Amino acid sequence: MFEILVIDDDRSIQMFLKRMLEKQGYEVITASTGEEGILRTLDSPPALIICDWIMPGLSGIEVCDRIKKDPKLSTTFFILLTSLDSVADRVKGLDAGADDFITKPIEQNELQARVRAGLRLHQLSQDLHTQKLLLETELAEATEYVKSLLPLPVKKPLNINFQFLPSRQLGGDCFDYNWLDPDSIAIYLLDTAGHGLKATLPAISVLNLLRSRALKDLNYYQPSEVLAALNNTFQMNYQNDKYFTIWYGVYNRVSRQLTYASAGHPPSIMLSGSSPTNTEVKRLKTPGMPVGMFPEAKYVDASCYVEKSSTLYIFSDGAYEITQSDGTLWSLESFIQILISLQYSVDNQLDYILNYLIDLNSKENFEDDLSILQVKFD
């Protein structure tokens, strides 16, 4: 049974509305002031509120404003009872959050119809809210599952650490590193287009495929061949129109050679040197379209020698495509400058980087997954 709250300082109108609505099968409670109405609403949220506009103390529009600002009461349907019928007054009521109006003197059939319509919308809002909570629960479970698939940080013979902060909707970031032999390690990070499970599932598929080395007769030491094989396997026509960017590298700790290839992914950043004044910055990126976008896409390798005490950062675009408080978008160049400034000033750079990005972000949650891999070679 739906519960309806009537707020009116006129006792006769209270009783009139109570009797009429109870005949329709509703449970009706009453309040004589706005303050009392708010307390009753907080104690037991009704499905619908009918509130007089002009009352001593809190007015109906003030009651409406307070109730609608409470997230727990957002689905409560609010009807303002008023003798004011100007457009300006109705606009003022709508701005406060009112859902409907009933003009005095009250016409019974109109009131009953508006209450029925309001309760239908309340039920619909409740159903949508329930579905939203279920979806958020599923996304939270999916987030935990993705986290469980990620590798653990390592300290020897390389020091590899990471930060992974999924967006509220969960995106398509995934990464891994594994030894191909005692001297060579493959490191990669990918970012699937879009959000939600449709983006996450292809990323998990790629992770499992590369981790198990299920692509037979593939030279996993050759990054360009790996990307070409992934492009043949994950054409977006067969993967829900989802494509992904990826950076894939293989490091040999004996020769200190890093061979890499990228597919539409941001450049990885290699920092070498002993102080901020003599830091060498290398942007490691090769030409190549995102995987799955074009069947005939070509990928090429590049390589570099890793100097002593170098650090490599591999990241998704969520690390720098951040909306600031002034509405502007942060940049890759600014992100690189943060990496350089922290390279020699602190030990746990990733913690400082993440805190800086959280403070920089103007929104409650990040719009995209944020993934950063850090590889310290010595």
List where the protein language model places each region.
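Acidic catalytic/metal-coordinating carboxylates
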Residues: 2, 32-36, 47, 59-65
